[in-house]
Amino acid sequence: MSNLLKEFNEQQMKLLSNKEIPKFSAGDTLRVSMKIFDGVSERIQVFEGVCIKRRNNGLHSSFTLRKISYNESIQLQVFLYSPTVESIEVVKFGKVRRAKLYYMLSLFGKSARIKERSNVARHAS
């Protein structure tokens, strides 16, 4: 039964992987364009923030973005293969030493800054 489920997930990933997904990790600043449905109209909303965690789990892969707007911390969990995700763009590559940046949740202002990575050639897709 698990092999059947695994094959189904792989088929769905192939169908949904027509959009280009860049290589990124925690600490990178991302710009995600998502489709938003307002009643009968549809528009694209852009969310830009720091990736605080990435979860690679096949079809259920996701990542969490965090940004500070008007002194409020906003977190958005985005599923990688969601049909509402229009595009993902890496704005900045961050230099961090952790895979999950949960310590960032309590930081604001200058203490929440992340250094920029200089060797981005090996991480570019």
From Swiss-Prot:
Record's function text: This protein is located at the 30S-50S ribosomal subunit interface and may play a role in the structure and function of the aminoacyl-tRNA binding site.
GO cellular component, one term: cytosolic large ribosomal subunit
Name of the protein in its database record: Large ribosomal subunit protein bL19
GO-annotated molecular function: structural constituent of ribosome
One GO process term, biological-process aspect: translation
Family: Belongs to the bacterial ribosomal protein bL19 family.
Gene: rplS
Organism: Ehrlichia canis (strain Jake)
Keyword line: Ribonucleoprotein, Ribosomal protein
InterPro entries the record matches: Ribosomal_bL19, Ribosomal_bL19_sf, Translation_prot_SH3-like_sf
Record's keyword annotation contains Ribonucleoprotein: yes
Ribonucleoprotein is among the record's keywords: yes
